[in-house]
Amino acid sequence: MKCLLILLVSLFLSQTAYSIDMGQVPPKVELKEKLGGRLDGKPWSSDELQGKVHVIFYVDPDEKDTNNPASEALDKEKFPSDKFQSVAIINLAATWLPNFAINSALKEKQERYPKTIYVRDYKKVLVQAWKIADDSSNVLAFDKKGILIFRKDGKLSAEEIQKLIKVIRENL
């Protein structure tokens, strides 16, 4: 019984140890090779979340349209590209859709939003490392130092979209 309790406590601590909270820099994650990476095959690292304000859309392909109003609102803001970067990370392990179909759709999105960095996560790396909601659409914003300044798991309301825009403006 004592061993079981120790095991359960260890599992709980390991599961919560990497959750990112507001005002914190998330633990480093790197998506490369079998774990994922950019559309062009190059690796992506969370170390890149510095120097500019970044917004990450971490999305299950089945929820791809959930936060379109937020991405469209950000696009309309025309934030300067030397101070702002959007990143779309696709949780490919969260869907039954074949990767080739998703990759085709991502290439179309890349053409529509050329300033956005598109990244594939084949193994739910961010779900595990940052405790992001799985099978969902998540929006996270980071300041120039890589500190989390906004987080929403699920659909953003109109008020939350305005809050996101305000937080970005305040940190540019």
Q: Where would I find each of the regions flagged by the language model?
A:
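Loop/turn elements at helix/coil->beta-strand transitions in domains of secreted/extracellular proteins
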Residues: 50-54, 82-85, 115, 136-137, ...
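Structural microenvironment flanking redox-active thiols in thiol-disulfide oxidoreductases
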Residues: 52-54, 62-109
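Thiol-/selenol-based redox modules, centered on thioredoxin-like
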Residues: 135-172
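N-proximal helix/coil linker or "cap" segments that precede and/or mark the start of modular domains
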Residues: 15-30
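Short, internal strand/loop/helix patches
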Residues: 87-89, 104-135
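Solvent-exposed loop/turn segments at secondary-structure junctions
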Residues: 61-65, 92-96, 123-126, 148, ...
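A short beta-strand-turn-helix
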Residues: 30-53
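Sec-dependent N-terminal signal peptides
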Residues: 3-13
